Amino acid sequence: GTPPLAEVVFVPKAGYTGLARLNYTGTDKNGAEFSGVVEITITAPTSSGTFADVGANYSWAAASVDYLYRAGVVTGTDATHFAPAQNITRGDFVLMLYRAFGLQNAGTASFADVPQDSYYAQAIAAAKAMGIATGGGGGTFNPTSPLTRQDAMLLIQRTINATGGSLRDGAEASLSTFADRGNVAPYAQGAVSALVQAGIIKGDNAGRLNPTGSLSRAEMATILHRVLTM
């Protein structure tokens, strides 16, 4: 027969609230068919159920932080803290992509500035082998440097495409509503446009992309949550 309903997990799209109706059919252990409807009311949490520092001020990120924590994509800075305002580094972001997408360890060659015994070395080596992480000049990756928003978008697009998905470069016109669209570097233009068109990137309350700005851990969580549930 089919699995009991208690064993079925429903994952709503990031940011969704309201009533979800799920029609189901199945067979019991004797082969008899059954069907029905499950109604689930989805509400937005006001704080994290795991981390004390993801409270009312970060209610917009709470569901995403908890989702990624349960999925094994992120960890806290300790058992009860997430440090949501802390800027995420390039190395840490690649590690989260590695966990989120199950990147394969296709190689051991990494970058000159990534120590082999660092906690993100395996993730960066895999990302390099898959063409996701290309680094900068001189064979370096700058893993401890803050990640810019446009570089995060480029890494996400490459990861999706390298793992069987398809996220083509978007149209430049999709950025027309953002006041700072001219600040997007040419190398990231297609990726930024693609993520905007897909609804993953929405900009800030002032209508800006802030492409060269850093990305906080809370912002990272909301973006990755949207990517994984889109």
Feature locations, PLM:
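Short, structured beta-strand segments at or near domain termini in extracellular proteins/domains
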Residues: Y24, M220-T222
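Catalytic cores of secreted/periplasmic or lumenal enzymes
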Residues: V192
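Feature responds to low-complexity, polar/acidic, surface-exposed segments characteristic
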Residues: T43-A62, R70-A71, T75-A123, A129-M153, ...
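Acidic, turn/loop-rich segments in luminal/extracellular domains of secretory-pathway
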Residues: G1-I42
